[in-house]
Amino acid sequence: FIAMVLAQDTDFILLDEPLNNLDIKQSVSMMQILRRLVEELGKTIIIVLHDINMASQYADEIVAFKDGQVFSKGRTDQIMQADLLSQLYEIPITLADINGKKICIYS
């Protein structure tokens, strides 16, 4: 489907759960391709994801929803905060820094 999206040559690309049913290898590959579209072609990409760790690795900004409402939005480093994510998910969250990116550890 990436070829169809590129053929349309729009400035904005909206994707609803593009990683659904992909294994981890293919999910990472997809996110790397999308990241290149941003960096090399100047595309703005909005993606619905349910994996906060995937978002933290590839997104410039995150909009977090809770109960159908915007809970928080901002740069990835602003959203990837343990207290904010614990409130969002209603579970204790610990963050680890791996290669300069934050990863959630669910406890």
PLM segments and residue spans:
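H-loop/switch region of ABC-family ATPase nucleotide-binding domains
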Residues: 49-50
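ABC ATPase nucleotide-binding domain "signature" loop
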Residues: 20-22
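A short, surface-exposed alpha-helical micro-motif characterized by mixed small hydrophobic
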Residues: 55-57
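Catalytic Walker B motif of ABC-type/P-loop ATPase nucleotide-binding domains
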Residues: 13-17
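ABC ATPase nucleotide-binding domains
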Residues: 86-107
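H-loop (His-switch) and adjacent beta-strand-loop-beta switch element
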Residues: 62-75
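Helical segment within the ABC ATPase nucleotide-binding domain
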Residues: 27-40
